[in-house]
From Swiss-Prot:
rRNA-binding as UniProt keyword: no
Catalytic activity reported: L-glutamyl-tRNA(Gln) + L-glutamine + ATP + H2O = L-glutaminyl-tRNA(Gln) + L-glutamate + ADP + phosphate + H(+)
Active-site residues, as the UniProt record annotates them: K91, S166, S190
Annotated organism of origin: Corynebacterium glutamicum (strain R)
Record gene name: gatA
The protein's role, per its UniProt record: Allows the formation of correctly charged Gln-tRNA(Gln) through the transamidation of misacylated Glu-tRNA(Gln) in organisms which lack glutaminyl-tRNA synthetase. The reaction takes place in the presence of glutamine and ATP through an activated gamma-phospho-Glu-tRNA(Gln).
Record EC number: 6.3.5.7
Disordered: annotated segments: 143-171
Protein name per its UniProtKB record: Glutamyl-tRNA(Gln) amidotransferase subunit A
SUPFAM superfamilies tied to this protein: Amidase signature (AS) enzymes (SSF75304)
Pfam families cross-referenced by the UniProt entry: Amidase
Length: 497
């Protein structure tokens, strides 16, 4: 199977080039940022009726930002960043002052934020035009974008299948040539899982290294913004733009940004000699799609052929990660989403003079939240209630500690861990929507990393022999060793060419 949206490209070859290539053309003045931005806006107009990657397209704002870059470059100024002038798609969970921020929920339909998220601000300061805001599962709760209040995103590889979630819009935009760069968020795999299903690269940085200020919270101890692109180098260049300490975020870590771009360039030689790669025993067993396991084993053998030493690693508490995650996350959701009460901002329903304030609040939440969000609020509220807090929430936090200890022990033996990113390739839209537990299981390989706050990457590892659809290879690195992801990821990418 091929991705006709990218393989066949479009009338304009600018939409099939990498971000690094586009930056080189713009900075050398062979093309203008306006030309590149307009090409991608035209591409969005041509194919987004099929894909539905975007919830909002800001044509005027994007072109104005591109013109500003061109003006500065023509005046002889140095580029504001290595990606200045290259346009980007932004997940609709980061606040923006010039475009609606809805988190794909009716609760925030049409909401205009009075401030930019720190990630948004850094993108603007880097001279990167924002093409628009991408589709997602409502409040980042889901694995397929089917929980979006505005309809699902379709996978460019097969329009009947999901592009993943929660950030399926960002990855689909990359895969369809609608954007060369995109930003996502990852709570339990929402960057890495869509990347795997769309044959793109997605990175969940170490927790605390990318600011969450202005990121609409799902689960505050798990959420992390991160970069996505079509190549490892492009992803590294964007990572460098958005990472860094932020005084507006109490969980932001004050330490130097890992040298991710340097690592990606060094890894491009394809050499993995001296690298110890751990294969996680719990993620390499029967029950996964045969084509996924076949591609994973081929990827491991490729790394061996590139000089890596392969070691099997046992992480026994990973088997308990799913249960712990789906207790901790709903508890944090229950707390975070209490702010959407119909009183201060967002939707206010049923305020016709016949209802009390409490009734208006209840009616607003009933009308504004979708079924999955309500399910998680109820589950979290129950788990936090008197008599159940110790039995459920605290026990889940103990398991979380054990998972972090499993990772720590593993990194005493190896430099990096690998696994399939997802148990199967992209499933058909509607296939799992009536079975929440089946949907939750799809994040099995990705969520342990979030519980431990470590760094992870998904990158293309070929097509499954049984479905012809993309398979992702997941790399997992210790905290604050994000550059190791890029070193190994770039080498693996080079070895596949």
């Amino acid at each position: 199977m091929t991705n006709k949206y990218l393989v066949e490209g479009s009338e304009n070859e600018l939409t099939t080039k990498t971000a690094a290539e586009l930056a080189g053309l713009i900075h050398s003045r062979e093309v203008t940022s306006r030309e590149v931005t307009q090409a991608h806006l035209d591409r969005i107009a041509a194919v987004d009726g099929d894909i539905h990657a975007f919830l909002h397209v800001g044509q005027e704002e994007a072109l104005n930002a591109a013109d500003d870059v061109d003006k500065r470059l023509d005046a002889g100024e140095a580029p504001a960043s290595a990606l200045a002038g290259v346009p980007l798609a932004l997940k609709d969970v980061f606040t923006t002052t010039d475009a609606p921020t809805t988190a794909a929920s009716k609760m925030l339909e049409g909401y205009m934020s009075p401030y930019d998220a720190t990630v948004t601000r850094k993108i603007r300061e880097a001279g990167i035009p924002i093409l628009g805001k991408t589709n997602m599962d409502e409040f980042a709760m889901g694995s397929s974008t089917e929980n979006s209040a505005y309809g699902p995103t379709h996978n460019p590889w097969d329009l009947e299948r999901t592009a993943g979630g929660s950030g399926g819009g960002s990855s689909a935009a990359l895969a369809a040539g609608q954007a060369p760069l995109a930003i996502g968020t990852d709570t339990g795999g929402s960057i890495r899982q869509p990347a795997a299903l769309t044959n793109t690269v997605g990175v969940k940085p170490t927790y605390g290294t990318v600011s969450r200020y202005g990121l609409i919270a799902c689960a505050s101890s798990l959420d992390q913004g991160g970069p996505t692109a079509r190549t490892v180098l492009d992803t590294a260049l964007l990572h460098e733009v958005i990472a860094g300490h932020d005084g507006f975020d109490a969980t932001s870590v004050n330490r130097p940004v890992a040298p991710v771009v340097q690592a990606a360039r060094e890894g491009a030689n394809g050499d993995l000699k001296g690298m110890k790669v751990g294969v996680v025993k719990q993620f390499d067993r029967d029950g996964y799609q045969p084509g996924v396991l076949e591609a994973f084993h081929a990827s491991v053998e490729q790394m061996r052929s590139q000089g890596a030493e392969i070691v099997e690693v046992d992480c026994p508490h990973f088997d308990d990660a799913l249960g712990a995650y789906y207790l901790i996350l709903p508890c944090e959701v229950s707390s975070n989403l209490a702010r959407f009460d119909g009183m201060r901002y967002g939707l206010r329903a049923g305020d016709d003079g016949t209802r009390s304030a409490d009734e208006v609040m209840a009616y607003t939440r009933a009308q504004g939240f979708g079924p999955e969000v309500k399910r998680r609020i109820i589950l979290g509220t129950y788990a936090l209630s008197v008599g159940y807090y110790d039995a459920y929430y605290l026990q889940a936090q103990r398991v979380r500690t054990l998972i972090a200890q499993d990772f720590a022990k593993a990194y005493e033996q190896v430099d990096i861990l690998v696994s399939p990113t997802t148990p199967t390739t992209a499933f058909k839209l509607g296939e799992k929507v009536t079975d929440p537990l089946e949907m939750y299981n799809f994040d099995l390989c990705t969520l342990p990393l979030n519980l431990a706050g470590l760094a992870g990457m998904s990158l293309p590892s070929g097509l499954a022999s049984d479905t012809g659809l993309p398979v992702g290879l997941q790399l997992m690195a210790p905290a604050f060793q994000d550059d190791r992801l890029y070193r190994v990821g770039a080498a693996f990418e080079a070895g596949r060419k």
